[in-house]
Amino acid sequence: QILTIDMTKVANVILYMLHKQVKHLSDKKVAIMLFLMDYNHLKFCEKKIFNETYVKGARHPEPVIVSELFDIVANEEDLEEDDERIFLMQELLDYLDIEVIEKEKFIELNFIKMEEEFDETLFDKDELRTINKVVNEYKETSSRNIANDCFKIDIVRTTPKGEIIIYIWFKFL
């Protein structure tokens, strides 16, 4: 299940957000933005962009695999060489440098663009439209306020904490 996520798309969407000068672009904001992109895309196009699974966290929806990778970076954990998360981590680090910033009560990750440019050919035009819509809507917003917006979404509000946020769409023909 772990290798189904499209890390190249995740890395590229972070590059796109850096290019668009999204404010307060920490690991937390990236996590919430990924959820909103997948949620919106699923709602309107009936498929996810990143193939990630999201769980309801205490403060916001958490992308399971991406959050795990961010925790590994934040805690400077060493992975065994046969750990498949190494491949995902490498894919992310091929595109971005990640700066670990120790705050008083938590660790924050900031993303730094390297040589790689955003590759829009990885996304179809509907995906680009969804990504652009979410980025434009939340470009200036703090992660706390975006998280609050997530809790206005019924499926997020009604899912118990720690459970997978399941999307069920009924099509009436």
Model-derived segments and their meaning:
Residues 1-173:
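Domain-edge interaction signal
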